[in-house]
Amino acid sequence: MPRMKGGELIAQYLVQEKVPYIFGICGHGNVGILDALYDVRDRLQLISPRHEQCAGHMADAYFRVKHQPVATLTSTGPGSANMVMSCATALSDSSAFLCITSNVPTSQHNRAPFQELYKHNQADFAQVMRPVVKRAFQPSRVDMLPLALRQAMDTMVTGRPGPVNLDIPYNVYQEEADVELPPASHLHRAHRPGANEADVAEALALLAAARQPVLFIGHGATLSEAGEEITELAERLGIPVITSPNGMGCIRGDHPLALGFIGRNGAYPANEAGRRADLVITLGTRFDDRSSSSWHDGYSWNFPKTRLVHVDIDPQELGRNYAPDLGVIADVKVFVRQLIKALPQRAQISAERYAPWLEQVRGWQAQWEAFVRPHFGDSTSPLRPEFVVGTLQRVLPDDVILALDSGVHHNWFMQFWQSKRPQSMLNSWGYSSMGFGVCGVMGAQLAAPGRPCVAVVGDGGFTMAPYVLCTAVEHNLPVVWIVWNNFAWGAIRDLQYGLFDGREIGTAFYKGQSGERYNPDFAAWARACGADGYTVTRPQDLGATVQQALKNQRPCVIDVHVDADVRPPSTGTWQLPPIPYKEPAYGKPFKA
């Protein structure tokens, strides 16, 4: 049995698991493992962004694109505390990475050394991470590392993915023990649970009784890589498909059966189909408030009058918000395959049966298109939001990976963007973390070096993490940041106008008391960092500027001035209790 230092064991294990990157920042608490990483630098690359939260967002986005985990590394105290946001973001959206944090040495536990959390328990950092990771491990000796590493890797990627924390006292990196590398993990994607025969038969019976079915697909569909099967099922039966943001791309956004997102900022056809359906087959979504119009009957859904088949790999999500008529614990890909295979057992389940319903849905699609399309050609300055989305849809290639930060721009993309491929539209949906898109796009680029990676980010979100330009220049990452510059925290400013009669305070950026709107020159900022920078204030310049940025194959910021006073047309609702909710701007609720 070889004698190894703890840091060597961790580095060798990551190499064995074919982890290509470790994102993190040095500190006195992890310097002991850096030497071990030096020895494997040709197989495991350390990339140091300028903030730990950014490291986590990069790792999160890497997994969303490639469905293979990487690792992060942080030092004791503040460095590791900065991981809370990115772990919460990943956990909320079922994304996985190995979060290695460092802690004070075991010989100093409970003595209040530099950066120890000790008020309730010695070296208590694992309790900080507990709510934001799938599991936390705290091996305090080198001989505890093999088991902890294997369990951490398996826990992270099996079932519903999630980040896992490995919190290590920094003496363990340098101490030695007689240890073996743990065996390689073979669990990732190896076990896909399916439905039992009775559940498949019941799902068929519900389909046979339905006249107006819809599919509602979410991140569980993306994680199981079920796009091909879902598209086949939808096409075979002529069933329209509603998507959550993290399910977008599983069926092409421009497919005739794709209705888009649902909820307040969803598309009108999706809300109309959702609230009028007599059967909803839900594949890997949890019906959060934004995709259910805050659970108000008739705005997006009409449960329990509408029958519900709820399929999810995580039993905790079945019935969380709506009690299903049939709850199925299964991998989405396996379940849809089972359903397709069993369809011949029920001859009455056919596209002909649902054709009148589909014709009705197509009418809603035509109405919505007639309502929104004229604004996609509006040539105004500052640029109209629909024009920006439409231009990017036209000039960006089908294989683009789009990373979206939180902000009002995200609402516009939810409503109108048509993702052409799965795992290509990255959102912080569950936790809505500002900075995710700004930082995550670099992780996406590392996961898919041959594909264009573009982040659309707000001016507020970008100024939370402007240091990303340094990392992109250092590592020659040709990512493009499109800054949606409306001189405001636009999403919250819109709430003030919609719910508080426009009593604007604290939601826009002004220079002193002059009333002059203020932001830095983002393009000059980019150039100062060694990246390319452009400013777009005229609509006729946007398309060519984006195309040039992609052609240059260099880090680039495009500062786009967007009209802050044009708001997405709501087609559902969303409530901030106890404030009364608003009626849709387009369409009306329908209560079955």
Report the location of each language-model feature.
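Conserved short loop/turn motifs at secondary-structure junctions
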Residues: 218-223, 377-378, 458-460
